[in-house]
Regions:
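Start-transfer (signal-anchor) and selected internal transmembrane alpha helices
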Residues: 1-57, 269, 273-280, 365-382
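Membrane-interface coil-to-helix junctions
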Residues: 45-139, 168, 177, 182, ...
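Membrane-interface helix-loop junctions at the exits of transmembrane helices
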Residues: 49-54, 159-163, 167-176, 287-298, ...
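Periplasmic/ER-lumenal interhelical loops and adjacent helix-loop junctions
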Residues: 67, 284-360
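Membrane-embedded helix bundles of polyisoprenyl
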Residues: 134, 138-147, 155-199, 207-252, ...
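Perimembrane helix-loop-helix junctions
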Residues: 239-282, 356-367
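Signature aromatic-anchored transmembrane alpha helix within multi-pass, membrane-resident enzymes
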Residues: 246, 279, 384, 434, ...
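C-terminal luminal/periplasmic domains and tails of membrane-associated envelope-modifying transferases
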Residues: 493, 530, 534-778
């Protein structure tokens, strides 16, 4: 079959081109301009639709957000929305009575302050997270275009460059932490550094001098706006922007120095002006942090994990997950690196960078980009610092250690402030792509019209699976269902009848979806809850939570509060008659409640009980235990108890007649531990700092009772008075943390945990059963 001439591509293009040029010049210009700006509008909308379910922009769809980190962020907004303005940036509903600031729940102070004035006009269920995502994608494309347009051969290639800068997978991968999708702030900073004219000295005197100072300070004013807005969004982004701004300060300050006849000559007027112009942006950044709530009494400045959430040296070309690249093979990373350190460029942009490097080395035309690269030199020192902090003290390349060392004690606390250090290479990543685009623009200004679309096609093909995964993450927004774990209407009645909601254990992560759904109801009625997952925990609130859990173990709860179990937990005998169950959740209704509810039923318990911070074993602990760690829990002294509802344990062998108890435990120093079960001594354990398995027989009566009461007594090996607490500085947390922090400044002869044990897991099994496998490494 032969195509007619008018349908052949060459002829078709020639005909269209001839007809276009036959139009009046004004019409041609209007069509070109309209098409250009139309594409500028459509491109970010298509990018948004590629990575998000478009229903997220419906502000009344809240159910999709009540999960993982999103739940923390939207609850912070909902609680603050229902507080009076007198609390400013603070609310006392989440983690009552101490509460949280907008920053401690990562609730986007910028949008929170924007929407709160209209709270009486907003729907009862309202979220701005979806609108924020759309806003960020549009702003990202806008600043990408502003950044690249002065260096592109034409406005069409500038659009291609803006799409390339907006097609980085790491931008959309951070949707779980919505404020970190504001990576357009980095592009804004690079635009100010690269494209905006440097400030100059003011002229004249008096009012003319002042007006000239502001008129000649466009870059300073730009940084004032940028640092303030960034400070209202997220401190990590502010740290990155500060590196770009710091590079500009370095350029202007040291640019005033030059060598004349082997002597260093400095223009002190320029240097003084540079210092003075640095003050307003810095001051506004501090003000923004204050408004958002970064400076709060009791808030821990940092958290553990520096070195775990680092940037892997293969991050730019490792997709991490098989579905995240259709071309390159993924290499699994440590849990923290695979999230915070994820910065895969996409195969299309990898080709872009490689092509730019090859052209820069081999072609003279690319050397014209040297002037552009030379202007970036002041960023060298700040970006090296960012890179080293991001890589951390544990650098890896495809899972192999490049270096690994212990941080000096003096650096541990400062490093904890930036524990999610893998993010800090974002400015470097964006500058890498910008530089590659400029090199290609300068070396192949005509061919780029073909090369850049090819790069974008390859990029789209490579990350299509990643795009689908991101859309799936927001797919619940397509439903108007609000509650998934707590659908019964009785929950609304119970919350209305109560003066607050208390959760046990006070650990949101044990069942975050249950917590978020009930807490949304509570905060919507301005009812306080006893706990909250915060970006930086408040040590005073932690002490309150621990005291509240100890009170529950003694049978003391607030009778006018709704008491909710995040996992099924044993309760003191005096509270059992009040226990009820709704939607499979164990609760104690508030006093005076007439809601008809069924009594609780135990789901079978595993015969192997673990005591990590997310394990059900933490529900079985009595008093004298510290906050659980990821793999176990320390007793707070030489005596500690726990209770196992033995009647509801599902054993590997049906109806066993006898049982043995195998414990995995360790201690801080060699100790002898006596173990009692239901008041009867069943054996002893010799524990050391190395975790060991210890098997003890249980009395026949253990299977006849309702509860297995286990008691540990540590036999001290040496006199208490000579046991000295470790001198290594540690981050204080747990029961009485705020008080212990103050007491730590005084010499304390005994560390309670030094006399305790760490319980990792317990296995109950018949004697003839094979020995249990070790479940955790020591």
């Amino acid at each position: 079959m032969t195509l007619p001439n008018w349908l052949r591509p060459g002829q078709l293009f020639a005909n269209l081109n001839a007809r276009f040029h036959a139009l009046p010049p004004a019409v041609r210009k209007g069509l070109v301009t309209g098409t250009h700006w139309g594409l500028c509008v459509i491109a970010p909308l298509l990018l948004f639709a590629a990575f998000f379910d478009i229903n997220v922009v419906n502000p009344t769809r809240v159910g999709w957000l009540l999960d993982e980190d999103w739940g923390q962020h939207v609850l912070g907004w909902n609680a603050w929305r229902h507080m009076p303005w007198s609390t400013f940036n603070h609310e006392t509903l989440l983690g009552a009575p101490v509460g949280n600031t907008l920053f401690s729940t990562d609730s986007n102070p910028l949008f929170a302050f924007l929407f709160k004035p209209f709270r009486d006009f907003l729907p009862a269920n309202f979220q701005y997270n979806g609108l924020w995502f759309l806003f960020c994608v549009v702003m990202h494309f806008t600043f990408a275009y502003k950044l690249i347009r002065p260096h592109a051969p034409g406005k069409w290639t500038a659009i291609g460059g803006a799409i390339a800068l907006s097609a980085l997978p790491m931008l959309y991968y951070r949707m779980r932490h919505d404020t970190l999708v504001a990576q357009w702030l980095i592009l804004w900073g690079l635009h100010l550094f690269i494209n905006v004219r440097d400030d100059t000295l003011p002229e004249g005197s008096g009012l003319r001098f002042v007006l000239s100072w502001f008129g000649n300070g466009q870059k300073m004013l730009g940084y004032c706006a940028l640092l303030f807005v960034t400070g209202m969004i997220h401190p990590y982004l502010l740290f990155m922007i500060a590196a770009i701004w710091g590079g500009d300060c370095i350029k202007r300050f040291f640019g005033a120095m030059r060598i004349v006849e082997r002597r260093l000559v400095a223009d002190w007027k320029v240097m003084v002006d540079a210092v003075i112009r640095a003050m307003p942006p810095l001051a506004l950044a501090i003000v923004a942090l204050y408004i958002g709530g970064s400076f709060t009494k009791g808030m821990s400045p940092g958290a553990g994990g520096y070195g775990y959430y680092s940037f892997p040296m293969d991050g730019w070309f490792n997709p991490v997950k098989p579905e995240f690249s259709a071309i390159l093979k993924a290499w699994p990373l440590d849990g923290g690196q695979s999230f915070e350190g994820y910065q895969y460029l996409g195969f299309g942009l990898i080709l872009l960078v490689i092509a730019a490097i090859v052209l820069y080395i081999t072609t003279p035309e690319a050397k014209t980009a040297r002037s552009f690269i030379a202007r970036l030199r002041p960023l060298t020192a700040p970006f090296i610092i960012l890179f080293l902090i991001a890589v951390s003290n544990h650098a890896q390349f495809y899972g192999y250690d490049v270096w690994k060392f212990q941080l000096p004690d003096a650096l541990r606390q400062p490093a904890a402030v930036l524990r999610a250090s893998g993010r800090l290479t974002w400015p470097i990543t964006y500058l890498l792509i910008v530089t590659a685009l400029v090199v290609l623009f300068r070396s192949r200004p005509k061919a780029i019209a073909v090369l850049l679309p090819l790069v974008l096609v390859v990029q789209a093909y490579d990350i299509a699976g990643m795009s689908r995964a991101m859309r799936k993450a927001t797919s619940l927004a397509s439903s108007d269902q609000m509650y998934y774990q707590t659908p019964s209407p009785e929950w609304d009645q119970l919350v209305t009848l109560s003066k607050g909601v208390d959760f046990y254990p006070a650990n949101v992560h044990m069942n975050d979806k249950l917590f978020y759904e009930l807490t949304w109801r509570a905060t919507s009625q301005a009812k306080p809850v006893n706990t909250m997952y915060a970006a930086r925990e408040n040590l005073i609130q932690v002490a309150n939570q621990e005291a509240g859990m100890d009170a529950f173990k003694r049978g003391e709860i607030k009778s006018d509060h709704l008491f909710v179990f995040l996992k099924q937990c044993d309760a003191p005998s005096e509270l059992w008659p009040r226990l009820r169950m709704l939607d499979g959740v164990w609760i104690i209704p508030p006093k005076g409640s007439t809601v008809d509810l069924q009594k609780p039923e135990w789901s079978p318990l595993r015969s192997e009980v673990r005591f990590g911070w997310l394990d059900q074993g933490t529900c079985l602990l009595d008093e004298n235990w510290s906050r659980p760690e990821y793999d176990g829990v320390w007793s707070e002294g030489p005596k500690a108890n726990l209770r196992i509802p033995i009647r509801h344990v599902e054993f590997d062998a049906p109806s066993p007649k006898k049982l043995e108890m195998t414990l995995k435990a360790k201690s801080r120093q060699p100790v002898l531990v006596t173990v009692l079960v239901n008041g009867v001594k069943v054996g002893e354990m010799n524990l050391t700092p190395r975790a060991t398995l210890n098997t003890l027989p249980l009395p026949a009566s253990a299977l006849r009772g309702e509860t297995l009461r286990i008691r540990f007594l540590v036999e001290e090996q040496i006199d208490e008075d000579v046991i000295v607490a470790p001198v290594t500085p540690v981050k204080l947390s747990g029961r009485g943390a705020a008080e212990r922090e103050a007491a730590a400044k005084v010499t304390v002869p005994v560390d309670a945990r030094a006399l305790g044990i760490k319980l990792i897991n317990i296995k109950l099994a018949p004697p003839e059963a094979p020995a249990p496998k070790t479940v955790l490494k020591s």
